[in-house]
Amino acid sequence: MTLLIASSSIGVIATGHAESSAVSVGRELAHSYDHGNCLACHSAPTDELAVTLANIAPPLLNMKERFPVRKVLFEYIWDARNTNPDTIMPPFGSHEILSSSEIHKIIDYLYTL
């Protein structure tokens, strides 16, 4: 029985670590010059690690409140042209700049802002 409790505790720790890891990877992708590079156009005023002078696109603030339906934000990052044909935002998913998994990790990070 002690072994079962220890296994349960490890499972909880692993789950918490996985969530933290997804946010961390999402932050790295959003800050990366060769992948997401969100900071090329967006500022992230509440992220002290996001150093940018960008003001081309809306700031990355209150993202969970602005996009309460995760799928809407995913589809916008995947290919914003589907919503706004005149957008200057790159179609990250449809042009294979980011994978579906990477976009989900970026959203995990954005939802902390």
Task: Go through the PLM ranges and name each one.
Residues 1-9:
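Bacterial N-terminal signal peptides
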Residues 11-33:
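Electrostatic cytochrome c docking/interface patches
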Residues 31-44, 74, 78, 88-90, ...:
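C-type cytochrome heme c attachment motif
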Residues 40-78, 94:
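Gly/Gly-Pro-rich "capping" loops immediately C-terminal to redox-active cysteine motifs
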Residues 71, 82, 93-113:
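C-terminal capping alpha-helices of c-type cytochrome domains
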